[in-house]
């Protein structure tokens, strides 16, 4: 086994946001959560180094993960990546295991499989990337698959600038290596920071073996700006779409479909173009038609859309919800709402038909109220159901009716002003003076 240390103390200034960088989301999940999941998949000893807005980050983590060991970086005294793993006396933070893997919290695309080459190394090791264009990165000079030195671009000569090997920002160390060299680390550089790369340089000077482990670039993209966050999200979306299609989900124009990590599919499902699936959703044997939005809801044996919006806590089973219908905290069981309706805080029974323009008036300005609709109910177009209201089964509601009282089963309900036709009214109205 090994211990994992995740570095998450930075300010994330380039994100230009009051939200801590590591809590910015990738497909609905804070990017820090991805790296924590990966860490717990390989270790029972996970450490998180914090400083900037640490209480906010800690609160978010504790809602989701158990067993994370939190540390506060002493940035006033020991800043930088090397300082992140130092205690007050410059010794490494205590870990359960002798092997220590160090990761950055802003790399949400890392997976267990992507780390395998680094995990298999028995020596102290640094993860490397081979970049076609390494401009802006420090170069890693190799000799017989071992790290000879790490040189910053501004200090590199012309030959070194041609090197394509750069630091991926992930490391595997033996604890005794950290104990030996961390106290020797210094901050005599332009940034006045302690760097893990300098730690490696100290080891090389003492003829320590440092393995160079090449990793796949896609998995080790660091997120330091909104542009990089968007790039990482697109890569994650590609993974989620592929996983869904591998399960048999039919996607029309996959690149136009957005889905989040909490979405699950069962049975035969179709997603038309422009669909957005947000939060923890279950889509089972269902067709989600073009440009519909499903949030924190369950769609089972049903068709939804096009241009429909199922807001949180909607459960739509054996039903049809058509274009421009919005549901919220609604339970539909075998019902139809073809178009242009708002169905909020309601339960609708089987074989019930909701006409165009029907609205459940669920909010009285202070509280939300529920509408209960039974089975075999026909609700005429442009009707308003003023909650709280209970409509029995086998009920017919005439078009344009405003319901303010419960309706017993078997009833016909009407409430409308009598129609008046005025003979020659048109001509009288438009008569010229």
Curated annotation (Swiss-Prot):
Chief location bin: cytoplasm
Cofactor list: Mg(2+)
UniProt binding sites for acetyl-CoA: 356, 362-363, 381, 399, 416
Entry GO MF terms: glucosamine-1-phosphate N-acetyltransferase activity; magnesium ion binding; UDP-N-acetylglucosamine diphosphorylase activity
Region feature N-acetyltransferase, mapped onto this chain: 248-433
Location in the cell: Cytoplasm
Family: In the N-terminal section; belongs to the N-acetylglucosamine-1-phosphate uridyltransferase family.
PANTHER family reported in the protein's UniProt record: BIFUNCTIONAL PROTEIN GLMU, NUCLEOTIDYL TRANSFERASE
Protein name listed in UniProt: Bifunctional protein GlmU
Organism whose genome encodes this protein: Helicobacter pylori (strain P12)
Gene symbol of the encoding locus: glmU
